[in-house]
Amino acid sequence: MNKILTPQNRQIFFFIVLAYAFSVLCRLDWVWWASGFDEFIYNGKIIINTNDGYAFGEGARDMLAGFHQEGDLSYYGAPLSTLAYLIVKFTPFSLEGVMLYLSAVLSSLIVIPLILIAKTLGAPRAGLCAALLASIAHSYYNRTMVGYFDTDMLNIVLACFIIWGLVRLNAYKDTISALIASLSMLIYFWWYSSSFTLNVALIAMFLLYTLIWHKKEKIYYLTMILMLLAITSIAIWFKILLFALILFLYKSKFYQLSNKQNAIIIALGALIFAIFALSGGLNPIWFQLKFYLLRSTPEKDTLNFIFFNVNQTISESSIIPFGLFSERISSALGVFVLSFVGYVLAIFRHKILLLSLPMCALGFLALFSGLRFTIYAVPFMAFGFGFLLEILGSALNERIKQKSLFLFHLCRFCIYKANLV
């Protein structure tokens, strides 16, 4: 108990509560604004402001009713609809209330992994600064505000929890960290199936990092095996069963006392990769590359009719100027520049932050593939800003200490001379 209630842990808890409350309160501003317009009121309640939100809400409504009509395209059983259904079923909250406020409650959880990453790296104040900035950066705020009932409310949160698990693994080399990273990826893939490409990029980056700096650490390879299993297209109950079996084997005396640990890890990795490949694991990667990177031109059929690619007709997929790009990520061009400098310095100081590159790269893809991607760069660019402030603050404190020490010795010298006189 005393270990849990250390001064540092109390400080981290205070930082998390402060940043979370700040994030939620900032999002409530939309409620006060919308309540002043009759167009946003229906049956005495504020309505949500996204089209997709009503589709997810319909799915939750049908789940509460226990049925839906065949062919009605209901989001019955969708992860967000399922979560809303469970909250309404087992709490006193109404479906309308859940649809309105859930985004503010869940998206504000972004502050937790950012602060915990900073704590693990020994810079908790940088984490607090990053949490405060990331929670209200234009891109993240706009896509997670009250009334924005969409999967975006957890997309970035879960990705950051994955990276926190890997940062923690790098510090402690324990199975708890491996579980944090792999279970976060499991939930992320269930929550948002389009996260597959980012998850693959995170695994690939972690593999590269491991081969360069930690190629003899077996716990790293175990974590990669579990992460790959998490994004395999098989039943979730079967994944959880395999998770348990793999961890049981890793902790067993059979493995711990074996002189063929490397062979066992390789065999496990080959087995999981085979399941991954046979379940169609490479197909989504190719689809995403075609859709976002190979931004071709209109598709043509044999009769020469021209059809625009979908990503050419969606405003979120439109190419944006650099000024708007920087404002979407860091709210201002100057802050963006400082954030970028701080992010580079943070990577030089802590190589493990290289694992955040896939998220930032996806965010920077917005320059070519549309503003919808800027949200991915928000948390770690904000971390870069916080880290830069941490460095500047430490340098300033050191100068103040040096000046204070100089003044102290100067005073001693003056007093000494005065006594001589």
Model-predicted regions and their roles:
Residues 28-121, 125-160, 188:
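Active-site lumenal/periplasmic loops and adjacent helix-entry segments of GT-C-fold
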Residues 23, 102-117, 126-170, 174-210, ...:
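Membrane-embedded helix bundles of polyisoprenyl
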Residues 198-265, 389-398:
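Perimembrane helix-loop-helix junctions
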Residues 237-244, 273-356:
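Alpha-helical transmembrane segments at the extracellular/periplasmic loop-to-helix junctions
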Residues 1-42, 120, 127-128, 245-273, ...:
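Start-transfer (signal-anchor) and selected internal transmembrane alpha helices
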Residues 12, 126-129, 168, 174-180, ...:
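Membrane-interfacial loop-to-transmembrane alpha-helix junctions, especially the N-terminal start
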Residues 266-270, 383, 391-420:
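Signature aromatic-anchored transmembrane alpha helix within multi-pass, membrane-resident enzymes
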Residues 354-357, 362-404:
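Hydrophobic/aromatic-rich transmembrane helices and adjacent perimembrane loops
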